[in-house]
């Protein structure tokens, strides 16, 4: 290992979009990492981020307390990155965001781990009409009750190579002349996955104040319309941005959400009704990305590095300056 560190970190959901970046950062810092996932056989790609034997995928189901306890056994630090956007079978919002988070927090407390980091989401609100936002907030409460010194991070939309948001609209822009625009005036503060991973790593290694909720937003605050204009620009397309009323979007989502992998659900439409930016309260309490000493990376720098794949001629497409 490059900076060998005897401490062991268990990361739940380490094989996902954010998790792979977190594993890479912590592995480079020399930590031993236990990757707790439902399918270890599908998590082999994360092992390449470290030296031989440094990263170990193990089976864990956060709905099963026994498997969670095995995963955190002898760990010094625990990180929970598990979350879902749509429910599927037993993987409901309540089961994952509340019960699963609670199980991990309790197991971490009983294992006497030094630090526990829980990834939530900006907009978490137990009074929200959105089940996603509501269960995220209730999950935070469950975590803090079980592990009072936990650090909770609430990021806005996360972008980067492999993200869901820009890649989804990029793919749509490549095949359709029209891009549907739900909540065109709703504000977002997209944050780069690398910045989120750094914040998680710093929180996990005790570099910021514990027992606190941090709101993470990026360098730019833009409306949905502005974000889709970026998609059109980066893909070199001439798509028409079509405003879609919330009532119509919910009607369409009612039918789409019965599909195995729905493109849109009613709950997602509800989330789009509210701004997703760092609150004045968090700024006043110094509970933002700046608290980590991290300067937010602009979309201007990152989007061109992966959105080129949706251009007619890929990287060889002539771009306007």
What is each PLM-predicted segment?
Residues 2-31:
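N-terminal Rossmann NAD(P)H-binding glycine-rich loop of SDR-like oxidoreductase domains
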Residues 5-8, 32, 84-146, 150-155:
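Conserved Rossmann-fold NAD(P)-dependent oxidoreductase catalytic core, especially the SDR/UDP-sugar
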Residues 31-41:
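Conserved glycine-rich Rossmann-like NAD(P)H-binding loop of the short-chain dehydrogenase/reductase
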Residues 40-103, 107-110, 122-126:
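NAD(P)H-binding glycine-rich loop region in Rossmannoid oxidoreductase-like domains
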Residues 103, 164-165, 183-205, 212-215:
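Substrate-positioning beta->alpha
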Residues 128-130, 151-170, 222:
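Flexible, glycine-rich beta-alpha linker
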Residues 187-194, 216-233, 243-254, 295-298:
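Substrate-binding strand-loop-helix patch
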Residues 247-321:
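A hydrophobic C-terminal alpha-helical subdomain
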């Amino acid at each position: 290992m490059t900076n060998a560190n005897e401490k062991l970190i268990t990361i739940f959901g380490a094989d996902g979009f954010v998790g792979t970046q977190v594993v890479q950062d912590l592995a480079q810092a020399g930590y031993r990492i236990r990757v707790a996932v439902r399918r270890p056989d599908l998590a082999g790609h994360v092992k390449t981020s470290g030296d031989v034997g440094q990263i170990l995928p193990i089976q864990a189901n956060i709905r099963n307390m026994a498997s969670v306890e095995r995963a955190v056994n002898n760990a010094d630090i625990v990180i929970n990155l598990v979350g879902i956007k749509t429910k599927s079978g037993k993987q409901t919002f309540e089961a994952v965001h509340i019960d699963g988070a609670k199980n991990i927090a309790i197991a971490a407390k009983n294992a006497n781990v030094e630090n526990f980091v829980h990834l939530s989401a900006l907009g978490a609100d137990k009074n929200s009409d959105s089940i996603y936002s509501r269960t995220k907030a209730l999950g935070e409460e469950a975590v803090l009750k079980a592990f009072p010194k936990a650090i909770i991070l609430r990021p806005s939309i996360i972008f980067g190579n492999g993200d869901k948001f820009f890649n989804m609209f990029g793919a749509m822009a490549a095949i359709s002349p029209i891009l549907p625009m739900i909540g065109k005036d709703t504000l977002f503060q997209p944050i780069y996955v690398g910045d989120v991973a750094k914040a998680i790593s710093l929180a996990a290694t005790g570099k910021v104040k514990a027992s606190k909720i941090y709101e993470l937003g990026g360098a730019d605050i833009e409306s949905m319309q502005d974000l889709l204009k970026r998609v059109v620009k980066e893909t070199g397309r001439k798509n028409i941005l079509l405003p879609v009323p919330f009532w119509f979007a919910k009607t369409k989502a009612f039918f789409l959400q019965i599909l195995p992998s729905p493109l849109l659900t009613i709950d997602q439409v509800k989330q789009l009704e509210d701004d997703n930016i760092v609150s004045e309260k968090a700024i006043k309490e110094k509970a933002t990305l700046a608290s980590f000493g991290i300067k937010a990376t602009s979309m201007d720098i990152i989007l061109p590095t992966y959105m080129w794949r949706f251009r007619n001629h890929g990287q060889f497409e002539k771009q306007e300056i």
